[in-house]
Every structure is written in structure tokens, then in C-alpha cells.
Amino acid sequence: MNIVKTEIDGVLIIEPRLFRDSRGYFFESFSEREFEEKVSPILGHSVHFCQDNESMSSYGVMRGLHFQRPPYTQSKLVRCVKGRVLDVAVDIRKDSPTYGKHVAVELTEDNHIQFFIPKGFAHGFAVLSETAVFQYKCDNFYHPEADGGISILDDSLGIDWKIPTEHANLSEKDTKHAKLKDFDSPFDINVDLYK
């Protein structure tokens, strides 16, 4: 796999190595050994995934921007196995030089790209195709009492979701998240979330 660093430290794009022939293609979607060898040195620590999730959504669905509060913080490794999504990570670590900045990447069933979102970031995506199947790995189990979010429609974040507002389809919970300016982040750049 090929690792692409983004403009925000720790947020990574992972391009798998595909083997194609007349029958189709094959690739390893995840190898713990290769992830440890190639990603952990960049991050400065290991990541051990413990839970896999999958969602199916229709065009215009926007999920996010989600995170889990300490001590149940999560890193995620995400991909789109059917359709097309715009996936976004927003830095919400206090005192970070990139606080409030984001990285956006289009994940599709054709490009097979994976996106690594570290702890201390809010994560969300928008469905750009008729339907999309989205899979993600987490390095901590889901804890509903630690669930948190910021508004996915906060204009101050400067995210072009590539969906007209009238087509945006959000859960009731996601419509109630605070905007970044009204948000008191539980994360701090000076606290190592991986200890």
C-alpha cells in the first residue's frame, strides 16, 4: 500500500496495491502487519483496530461530524465499497496550528482509497452517488455516553460538500450539533490521546 500524507499531520490517505487481470482485481483491504510497518512510524505510535462498521446511505445523506470524547477516543480507517462519498476530517484539538481546518477526500468503489482519521478529529461524509456502502474500522468500541459532534453544515469550516443544501439529508441528532465557534473541544494538542 502507498501512504500519502495530507496537509494535516496524522491524517493519511492510503492507496492499496491492486492486482488486475481479465477476471477482475484483487487487493488486501487491510493488513495489520503492513499498517504497523508503514503507518505507525508516521504517526509515532501503533493503532489497533477492534471494531468494523458498515452503513448504506442514499444520495444527499450527510453523516457527522462525529467523534468520541476521552477516555473513549477513536481513530478510524474508512473506505467506500459501493458508490461515491466525500469524506472529511476536521481538526478539533485545542491549540493545534490546524484547529478548525479540514482534509476532504473522495472515496469511491473505483479508486479503493482509504482514509485514516486520527483521534482528536471530527469525521463525517456526504453521499454523492445514488447509494453508497461505507465501511470503517475503529480502534475503540462505540460508547454512546461519549458520543459528540459538531455541525456538518457549519459554513465557517469551509467544506464544499458537493451537495445542494436542499438535497442534504441529516439525522435529527446531527442537526443539533453546535457550530465550531460555540464548541468547547474535549481534545488538546498537548495531550497524547494514544497513551
Locations of the language-model features?
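Non-catalytic, conserved peripheral segments adjacent to functional cores
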Residues: M1-D110, T131, C138-K195
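Conserved metal-binding segment of the jelly-roll/cupin
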Residues: L107-T131
